[in-house]
């Protein structure tokens, strides 16, 4: 469940910063996915204690799709993720912001597949969150080096 949720504006684009403790995501709509936008947003994560990773989630509500760009703090690496469970939860938190009580669930299409994120709210607060989806395994392959 989120430690904090707040509206933030970056380069004229309003989005929602969701702190999930250890990882935080800035969920934004109507922005073309780019490393440049991540760099512009990066400073909004600086005041959050104990982050192992942070990301910008480029959300398209109409298509129910998202593209996650995540930075791992320790290695200073920026990665276009194929799928992101915590980013999916952040999107569900954002999309359910106006709910006082009840559940919200959405399957978010991502570059490597779909992840279903669900949140339960009580008194306006998120009291439970979960993710799920189909998992497939490819045939093992052997590589000789």
Describe these PLM feature segments.
Residues 1-83, 90-145:
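Active-site proximal loop and beta-alpha junction motif in alpha/beta enzyme cores
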């Amino acid at each position: 469940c989120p430690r904090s949720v707040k509206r933030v504006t970056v380069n004229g684009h309003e989005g929602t910063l969701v702190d999930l403790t250890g990882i935080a995501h800035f969920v934004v709509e109507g922005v073309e996915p780019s490393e440049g936008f991540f760099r512009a947003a990066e400073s909004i994560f600086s005041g959050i204690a104990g982050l192992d990773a942070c990301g910008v989630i480029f959300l398209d509500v109409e298509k129910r799709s998202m593209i996650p760009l995540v930075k791992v703090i320790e290695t200073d690496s920026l990665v276009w993720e194929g799928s992101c469970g915590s980013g999916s939860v952040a999107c569900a938190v954002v999309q359910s912001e106006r709910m006082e009580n009840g559940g919200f669930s959405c399957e978010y299409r991502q570059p490597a597949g779909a992840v279903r994120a669900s949140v339960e709210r009580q008194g306006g607060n998120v009291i439970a969150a979960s993710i799920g989806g189909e998992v497939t395994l490819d045939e093992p392959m052997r590589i000789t080096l």
